[in-house]
Amino acid sequence: MSKAALSHLVRELAVAMAPKVRVNGISPATVVKGSTMFPRDRVIASLKKYKLPFDENDTDDGLRNELAQFYATRTLTHQAIDPKDCAQAIMFLAGPLARCTTGHLIPVDGGLTEAYLR
């Protein structure tokens, strides 16, 4: 699902389910760590696409880390997005501190979008 479609879905569900249910979501940047969407061949293809040096003999985790670090350099925080970062945002949205928040997506992207506004 595209991020635009997700944003629209979250807003529409928030309207339909209010006031008893809050509907929110997260919009993460690329999460490489722990992702099944990044098998070795895809990681190597991405490293080649971006002309990043790598060792073919490196472990799968080592190659994924190289790719994650490259993606991190493209953000304002220079931090790789980790599944734990996404989980923390979800926990916030599900908890009492967000009791008046509904119909929104929280970007978990290290400022990726803003990095390209410059």
Regions found by a protein language model. Give the residues of each.
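A conserved structural motif in NAD(P)-dependent oxidoreductases
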Residues: 59-64, 75-86
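Short, flexible catalytic-loop segment of classical short-chain dehydrogenase/reductase
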Residues: 27-39, 48-56
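Active-site helix of classical SDR
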Residues: 2, 10
